């Protein structure tokens, strides 16, 4: 989180300019992925890359919804107060919702095949990964979880992949 609130930046021209410039750059680079896909010169109305990209997009969208729903249902259960979810998609990744959001951006690379600007399609997934992994989503969430859940969350970190879903790793406490 670069700025805590709009009130903090609107009174300082430099902060205001920085915030709006960063937002403009973000929109430009992420929209470039869609632009590259839209300008594709593929002759087929719906080729294999478009099919794979569309299926991946739909899968990512639906699984992101499933991850959010799993977490919401977990939090609604009074027995889970003070706990964090380790089941379902959350047993495969500490941030499955972020991963499947990122997958959405990756599909534009496939949809852009055939465009002279196909390489621009990489800007969306690369920027989204950097922002989610290093600047906004994951660092903030992990820091907050460590603060509120301590060693229990550290154990979860050791046993569960951070971003890319995979099988849980064995820790010293887990029997073979």
Go through each PLM region and give its residues:
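Hydrophobic transmembrane alpha-helices
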Residues: 1, 27-70, 74-176
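Eukaryotic endomembrane system proteins
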Residues: 21-26
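Juxtamembrane helix-capping/reentrant segments at transmembrane boundaries
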Residues: 3-18, 83-90
């Amino acid at each position: 989180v670069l700025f805590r609130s709009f009130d903090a930046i609107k009174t300082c021209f430099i902060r205001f300019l920085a915030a709006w410039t960063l937002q403009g750059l973000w929109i430009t680079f992420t929209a470039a992925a869609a632009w590259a896909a839209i300008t594709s010169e593929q002759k087929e109305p719906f080729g294999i890359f478009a099919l794979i990209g569309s299926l991946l997009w739909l899968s990512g969208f639906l699984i992101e919804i499933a991850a959010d729903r799993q977490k919401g249902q977990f939090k609604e259960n009074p027995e889970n107060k003070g706990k964090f979810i380790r089941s379902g998609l959350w047993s495969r990744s500490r941030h499955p919702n972020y991963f499947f959001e990122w997958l959405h951006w990756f599909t534009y690379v496939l949809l852009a095949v055939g465009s002279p600007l196909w390489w621009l399609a990489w800007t969306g997934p690369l920027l989204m990964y950097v922002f989610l992994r290093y600047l906004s989503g994951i660092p903030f969430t992990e820091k907050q979880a460590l603060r509120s859940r301590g060693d229990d969350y550290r154990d979860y970190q050791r046993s569960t992949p951070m971003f890319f879903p995979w099988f849980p790793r064995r820790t010293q406490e887990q029997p073979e």
